[in-house]
Amino acid sequence: MREKIARKEALLVCGCGTGLIARLCDQAGVDLIGCYNTGRYRMNGIASIAGNLPIGNANEVMFDMAVKDILPVVKNTPVIGGIFGLDPTRDMQRFLKSCYDIGLSGVQGFPTIGKIGGQIRKEYEQVGFTFEKEVSVLAYARKLNMLTMSYCYSVDEAKMIADAGIDLIIPHMGMTTGGDNGTKEQSPIDVAAEKTEAIIQAALSINPEIIPLCHGGNISEPKDAEYIMHHTSAKGFVGASSIERIPTEKAIKNVCAGYRAIRL
């Protein structure tokens, strides 16, 4: 990845909720493929944010997707598993070893407590469900020689991530806009760029080797990602809804319209 960055080539990480999407992204030569619980919901017509609700165990869903859907069809691209590091129902160190054993090349902290704010966040933290603990789980994954990635929602979180030596940081600008199940509005792209850069600089001030990417909000098309990368220090883009959901929605509607236009 560092060689690509040195050649001024943007990195691309694609979240894939089905084997078909993963196979196509693999053939397209993307840098990393992400396998998260949200992909299963997203590609079954449910808003991605459902992955943050108590309707399924995020780690079980990801592991099942990885074993049955994603890893069997990906031939060339490293696959990263989205883990919920605060899962109280399992030994996360053993789980990480299982992730390594099935062929995952790395892990990303997702779903994450970082997405939650307000009073409920304070209550979670008071009983030990903290972002710092999530980061410590990712740090353990590094000891297993796994690539580590973390979404980030604030400058303070960025410092935790950088201090733990996590490999890639991804400032998260919120749920992706556009399509049938995306948010209708988020911060303007210039505001997203400012917030992204503030998070990146906080991380780089502690760990200059961390690789920053961008994701979410109004960064939903290549031109948006290009704007962010030209106005921040981000070296690439993480896409999920913008890679698999929105393009699929457009393509299926267009081809169906073509068939429906046939007259006898």
Task: Label every PLM stretch briefly.
Residues L32-N44, D101-G117, L168-T183, H231-V255:
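Glycine-rich phosphate-binding active-site loops on the catalytic face of alpha/beta enzymes
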Residues T112-S136, D156-Q186:
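Histidine/lysine/aspartate-rich catalytic loop segments that bind and position anionic ligands
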